[in-house]
Amino acid sequence: MGQSKKLNKQPSSLSPLVQLAGIRKCFDGKEVIPQLDLTINNGEFLTLLGPSGCGKTTVLRLIAGLETVDSGRIMLDNEDITHVPAENRYVNTVFQSYALFPHMTVFENVAFGLRMQKTPAAEITPRVMEALRMVQLETFAQRKPHQLSGGQQQRVAIARAVVNKPRLLLLDESLSALDYKLRKQMQNELKALQRKLGITFVFVTHDQEEALTMSDRIVMMRDGRIEQDGTPRDIYEEPKNLFVTGFIAEIHMFNATVIERLDEQRVRANVEGRECNIYVNFAVEPGQKLHVLLRPEDLRVEEINDDNHAEGLIGYVRERNYKGMTLESVVELENGKMVMVSEFFNEDDPDFDHSLDQKMAINWVESWEVVLADEEHK
């Protein structure tokens, strides 16, 4: 949808590390995971994305061994771990709260897991310091958690999780407690660390920006089911249904009715009361209801010189907001629908000199739209 966006690409030729087959889980008689199949590949950064209550954290806890499945099987590196206790799974989890021991130093927190595994004493110091160097905290080794910022505490939790070299690292909403600026910084650091370590990361979040920024692959969930599984670009550019479309980013959904098919790719349709050509890659019939999906950055507003020859949707500029690099225009269509248009700002372009209440046409480049069937009238 729109221009090609340089989002993370899924690594190719990866071998499976974790396989979930026929997973079912109930709580208090309520089925929260009805039937789930998922493969997680070696070395990838996979994000489970979805709203609260969609089952993403339950899936994470099942992989970690913190919950037991009611039916189904969990494989780790071709070994059945369905009934293996959490402490024997070679899987570590970083929680939202970090759960650092307040009475221990940073060094002691990171060393705790190694001591529990009875790692030889001579190995502990070099391994702890190596883990702290990876998260740029080697000079903080003797500090206590209360002497650290939120971002530093989060890094300590990650160092503690990776020091014993797990096969898999699970992160449950582990950035959500940070402020916006620090969260953005940690997104980049976390992805860089994952690449450096080569450990498979499974990250749980409800934040679509986090998912798009860090992931090799996103698994979009709703009601315990997978709605879409793909690269960030797949999810953003080619959403499979209206749920994914509405969740992943701000988007406009225009109602359309098929008039006729023009050729293999294009359909003539009535879109919000105006005839337009749209690209439709599935069979349609005259009169069929569709949804045309376009993001604010895919749209352009143009002055109307002749109403009879104007192309696109017609409306009136109601608001104009300067955002530095972009200019956002709120246009009210003739049918009352409000549409946000976001364009790169160019003060030398006379087309940007719109006045409030000016009559304008909204257009887009053909094929930038995503068209879905109306799910209520299939």
Swiss-Prot record:
PANTHER family, alphabetized: SPERMIDINE/PUTRESCINE IMPORT ATP-BINDING PROTEIN POTA, SPERMIDINE_PUTRESCINE IMPORT ATP-BINDING PROTEIN POTA
EC number: 7.6.2.11
Alphabetical list of CDD domains matching this protein: ABC_PotA_N
GO MF: ABC-type putrescine transporter activity; ATP binding; ATP hydrolysis activity
Subunit structure: The complex is composed of two ATP-binding proteins (PotA), two transmembrane proteins (PotB and PotC) and a solute-binding protein (PotD).
Keyword terms, alphabetized: ATP-binding, Cell inner membrane, Cell membrane, Membrane, Nucleotide-binding, Translocase, Transport
Naturally occurring in which organism (per UniProt): Shigella flexneri serotype 5b (strain 8401)
SUPFAM superfamilies: MOP-like, P-loop containing nucleoside triphosphate hydrolases
The protein's enzyme class: translocase
Protein name in the entry: Spermidine/putrescine import ATP-binding protein PotA
Gene Ontology CC annotations of this record: ATP-binding cassette (ABC) transporter complex
